[in-house]
Amino acid sequence: MSMVDTAPGKIQVRDLNFYYGKFHALKNINLDIAKNQVTAFIGPSGCGKSTLLRTFNKMYSLYPEQRAEGEIILDGENILTQAQDIALLRAKVGMVFQKPTPFPMSIYDNIAFGVRLFEKLSRADMDERVQWALTKAALWNETKDKLHQSGYSLSGGQQQRLCIARGIAIRPEVLLLDEPCSALDPISTGRIEELITELKQDYTVVIVTHNMQQAARCSDHTAFMYLGELIEFSDTDALFTRPAKKQTEDYITGRYG
């Protein structure tokens, strides 16, 4: 395993192990996620990349049989401790899932929903926040005249951008994207990829993808995982052109996975 030469990381993972019951899903993971960069996790199905992503906002805490051991340091604090406030963590670390998941409410309320949980804004300030989030997600021009229509009225690609807008509306520091383009057509995928590149100006972005070309296009750093282990972690260009490990080379050249 090699670590990217960035110090200190926005997220620092130290000796992380994760278990689904007795199944050891992540094994001694160590890496630093660089601030205001895009980091991609790649690897075959079941390698642990989505599991690792979900430890960053403790999504596993919903399931008592799942547990993490080790440290994940965010802004100097280990988020894996029992003292960690889950709601505040998820305000700081936003997440967008594989399939678009708009709430059953208007486009406007999809954006405003999370904001209302953490802030008391005037109507004018909320209007401004909704416009800001939709603009950041490259969706404002397509929705500004139909904000009170259902989020379900949007196309699949628009719904995913709505979910990204919803995620950034509460102004997190980190944005997690779990296969955000897997259910989208190539045109919508292209727009999401452009958006990911733009978002790193304001956020630390971590993306899980099966699409190695997507990782190569969008990310600054890439981690290759296999069977719960971090095999290699490097600058994206270096990992794809000069992999240090044979397992990495075999995967990116299609020899297995």
UniProtKB/Swiss-Prot annotation:
PROSITE patterns: ABC_TRANSPORTER_1 (PS00211), ABC_TRANSPORTER_2 (PS50893), PSTB (PS51238). It is found in: Cell inner membrane. GO terms for molecular function: ATP binding; ATP hydrolysis activity; ATPase-coupled phosphate ion transmembrane transporter activity. It is an enzyme of class 7 (translocase). It comes from the Bacteria. Residues 11-252 form the ABC transporter domain. ATP binds at residues 43-50. The complex is composed of two ATP-binding proteins (PstB), two transmembrane proteins (PstC and PstA) and a solute-binding protein (PstS). This is Phosphate import ATP-binding protein PstB. It comes from Enterobacter cloacae.
